[in-house]
Amino acid sequence: MENFPTEYFLNTSVRLLEYIRYRDSNYTREERIENLHYAYNKAAHHFAQPRQQQMLKVDPKRLQASLQTIVGMVVYSWAKVSKECMADLSIHYTYTLVLDDSSDDPHPAMLNYFDDLQAGREQAHPWWALVNEHFPNVLRHFGPFCSLNLIRSTMDFFEGCWIEQYNFGGFPGSDDYPQFLRRMNGLGHCVGASLWPKELFDERKNFLEITTAVAQMENWMVWVNDLMSFYKEFDDERDQISLVKNFVTCHEITLDEALEKLTQETLHSSKQMVAVFADKDPQVMDTIECFMHGYVTWHLCDARYRLHEIYEKVKDQDTEDAKKFCKFFEQAANVGAVAPSEWAYPQVAHLANVRAKGDVKEAQKPILSSIELVE
């Protein structure tokens, strides 16, 4: 395995953060912890229900880690929406992460998908059954146009995960395949449309801005994720079907060339995102900026992405990019580094056990000693 291109990664990250003028001021520390705990608590109780536990069949530690990651993403990035909307989105996106980590073949349970949908019957696929049950709680926050985007993008995501079950990075020469798969499983339209709850935005009045935001967010959000995930995925056997690796296969180029391709497209998208909305509705621009900055903070601070390892590796280096990266990392950590023990309690497994015993009051107590074990 070749060595990770640290210097290149530092330069790319610094340029990205400079392009978006990174300065996360979305919350005070108290507000961040309050929103994290509210969204987490509602979502944890949701996934602790017997039906969810029985149908999802997810390892408790994996479910706990997935929920904490997603709550962080939503709270940090969807800074303008209500706490209730944050909680409902956290549940929805946790379902998507659970599916993304699944290895079950969806084919048998999807044979009668449309017939069941048309007849109003419960879906045979357990993931769809649970997601459809929760969808009204999500869609109540949005107008019909944004809701349609959420539904359609979630269906695309399911199909993208289905394709990934085959561990297929594309045929050499199939230049369209990498971006096709990344758009399919990126949830870009779902994310882009879920920034505009109807209590804050009239989707008819802001239709053009919202449509453009959905279009721009489709690429920006997934490309930034791919760049910030590149380190953790570099030598992980489970993450070899990535956009960068698929560029290598389909475009028949080197890994360095593939990373440069992603870098240039991400930086161009970042420039566009800032420029296009600079003279538009100030509330729209503020929402987009808060999302961009919060999304970056989440990546820099969430243990899943292991970027603290890069920081520790280069913090004593004297290069300009190393110093800039460390400054940005410290800036993010100052606002976003919040220990799970401060908000992610009680654990889902504990709630599920308490529900089984019927002791609801006991379920409200924090269990800080065990929560620290979950990254």
UniProtKB/Swiss-Prot annotation:
Coiled coil: none annotated. One of its GO terms (molecular function) is trichodiene synthase activity. It catalyses: (2E,6E)-farnesyl diphosphate = trichodiene + diphosphate. Its EC number is 4.2.3.6. TS is a member of the terpene cyclase group of enzymes. It catalyzes the isomerization and cyclization of farnesyl pyro-phosphate to form trichodiene, the first cyclic intermediate in the biosynthetic pathway for trichothecenes. It serves to branch trichothecene biosynthesis from the isoprenoid pathway. Trichothecenes are sesquiterpenoid toxins that act by inhibiting protein biosynthesis. This is Trichodiene synthase. It comes from Fusarium asiaticum. The lineage of its organism: Eukaryota, Fungi, Dikarya, Ascomycota, Pezizomycotina.
